[in-house]
């Protein structure tokens, strides 16, 4: 049985409507929007919800496939659009692993060798569910987004796949923050190394401008800027 057949009918209807239509963006007056952000793995909207609340000219699209978390973000601000789905390198459906630590939930499975570096944290998988996935280039095309000024990614092991899913539209993204695992053994199967991420980003015209240590030095947030993309950068 494939992932699509496991998804509830309402989820399939939502997916079909989104992929055939123009998403939720047409409900906004584009003439009043001066900045567009995309938050992938929004969790509780750290850093992006407050920005939307304080700037009516900012439009944020927040992707959060965990419905419990997504429901806490919905209807918080008219310019903060919550999309209860995941961003990946394919359009369709995928298995999503819900972790005891909700910000560790992921489309990727955990590597038991990598988990040994996280003995101080409960990282047991509570359940799994089927979620809708969409590529960034599909999303940007359907919503007719000319650019994304800021792309914030916290997708637990699949951050680089999110970037790669932008395809040719990557050149229309001005600033990207993503997370990398810098432990000797990475936590998620298939997660790229710090060097692989930097090589890919620099090869696509991005410059590393900031590094922030996370989780007792086991992860880092890397921020990249693409000067030729133009737009407004936070």
What are the residue ranges of the model-derived segments?
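Phosphate/nucleotide-binding beta-alpha loop and adjacent structural elements of enzyme active sites
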Residues: 1-234
């Amino acid at each position: 049985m494939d992932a699509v057949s496991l998804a509830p009918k309402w989820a399939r209807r939502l997916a079909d409507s989104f992929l055939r239509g123009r998403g939720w963006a047409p409900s906004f007056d584009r003439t009043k929007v001066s900045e567009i952000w995309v938050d992938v793995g929004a969790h509780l909207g750290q850093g992006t919800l407050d920005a939307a609340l304080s700037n009516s000219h900012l439009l944020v699209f927040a992707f959060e496939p965990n419905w419990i978390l997504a429901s806490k973000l919905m209807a918080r601000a008219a310019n903060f659009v919550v999309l209860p789905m995941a961003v990946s390198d394919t359009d369709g459906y995928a298995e999503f692993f819900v972790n005891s630590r909700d910000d560790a939930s992921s489309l990727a499975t955990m590597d038991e060798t990598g988990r040994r570096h996280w003995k101080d944290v409960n990282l047991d998988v509570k359940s799994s569910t089927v979620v809708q996935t969409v590529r960034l280039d599909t999303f940007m095309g359907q919503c007719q987004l000319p650019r994304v000024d800021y792309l914030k990614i916290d997708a637990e092991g699949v951050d680089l796949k999110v970037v790669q899913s932008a395809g040719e539209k990557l050149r229309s993204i001005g600033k990207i923050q993503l997370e990398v695992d810098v432990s000797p053994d990475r936590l998620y199967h298939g997660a790229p190394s710090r060097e692989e991420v930097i090589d890919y980003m620099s090869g696509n015209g991005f410059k590393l401008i900031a590094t922030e240590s996370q989780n007792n030095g086991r992860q880092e947030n890397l921020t990249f800027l693409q000067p030729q993309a133009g737009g407004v950068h936070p």
